[in-house]
C-alpha cells in the first residue's frame, strides 16, 4: 500500500528548539499509512523548494503558527502553496489558531482548516477524514470552510499525555539542531497545559486550566532511550511548568542518577512549586544535572503580583533564589513591566527586586519584557471591554511585536528608563569579560542610584561589539 504524504512546516524564527509540536502530531500518525515530511525553515535553507517538491503528491500541508513574525512566514508559504496547488488542503495549528480559530479562515483564502488546542488526536482524525473524504464535521477541535461558511466543531478534551507513544525524532535530522545550537542540546516536552490562572497569560483560555504530564517512570524511560540514541549532553525541557508535581521531578532526578545518565538539564519552575521541595529534592535535582531553572516573577510588587493573579508570594521567590544559590543552580527570572495603570511605586519595587536578585548570585539573570495585550488573557479581555482595539486581521497580527516595544500607554520617559535599566543591569551583573570590568562597576553604580543620564557606556559597548548589543 502506497503511503500518503503529509507535509509539516515549521516557520522561520530566531530560536532553534526542535519542532516538538510537529514531532508530536507526526508521531501520532501510523507510519505504515503516512509518510511524514517535516520541513523547518530555520534549518532547511531551501525550505520553499522542499515544500513545492513534495506538494504534488501530498495529502495536506500543515503549519504550526505563532503570532508575529512566524505567522508572517506561514502566510507567505501558504499563499505560495495555494497558488501552485489550489486543491491541496492547507491546515494551520498552534497558539495563534487556538486563540483565533475562525479569523484566518475569514481573512485569508490560503487557509482551509485550523486546529485548536492539543493536536495529536485531532490531527490524526483530520488526516484520516481527508484521506477517506469523510465529513469534517465529525472531527472535534477544528474550524473549516464549507461552501463559503466557516464551521467550528466542538472542542476536544485534553488527553492524558501518557497515552501517546514515544516521540519519533527520526522525523527530523537531530544532528542539524545540535549544529545550529552549537552544542548537543536535546529538547523534550513532558506535559501540556497549566493549572494556574495568571491574568496576563493565554494558557487558561486555551487549556481551561487543565494539565497532563508524563509519569516519572515514563520520563526516565524516554530520556534514557534518547540519551543512548543521540548521545546529547544537555536536556532542555520545554514544558510550561515542569515542576508542577515537585515530588515527581525528585523521583525523575533519582532515576537519572541511578541510570547513570550523565547530562545537564534545564526546566521551568513556579516559585510556589520550588518552595514545596525538600532540601533533599533540591540536592538530588542538582546531583542529577539540573543546571538552570526559569522562574517567572513578573513584578517586585506584591500588590501587582496579586493583581496579576500569580498566586505567589514574593517570599517564595526569594526562597527559591536562596536554594538555587545554595546548590549553584543558575536562574532566569523574567519580569513584565508596562502594564496599563502600573504605578511608579510598582515600578520602583520591581527595579529594587531585580537588583536584589542579581546581587545574590552571578548565575542569576533577569529578563525584562514589556506587557503586550495578547488575546485570551483576563487583562486583555478587560482592556477590550474598556475600548482598547486589538489588531483586527490576521495580517495585522502577523506584524504584532510582542517582545521589543512597549504599549502606547507607557510614557516615553518610562520607556527610556526601562531601556537604560535593562542595558545597565545586564552590563553590571551579567558581564563576564574581564576587560569590561570597569564599565560593569560603573553600570552597577548607575543601577543602584537609578542614574542613567548621558549613557556613554552604551555607545562605547556598541562601538566595541556592535554584533553583541546588551540591550
Regions found by a protein language model. Give the residues of each.
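Radical SAM enzyme core and accessory elements
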Residues: 2-11, 31, 47, 54-59, ...
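Residue-level recognition of beta-strand->loop/alpha-helix junctions
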Residues: 38-42, 205, 335-337, 370
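Short N-terminal binding/cap micro-motifs at the start of the first secondary-structure element
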Residues: 15-20
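Catalytic cores of alpha/beta
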Residues: 101-107, 341-355
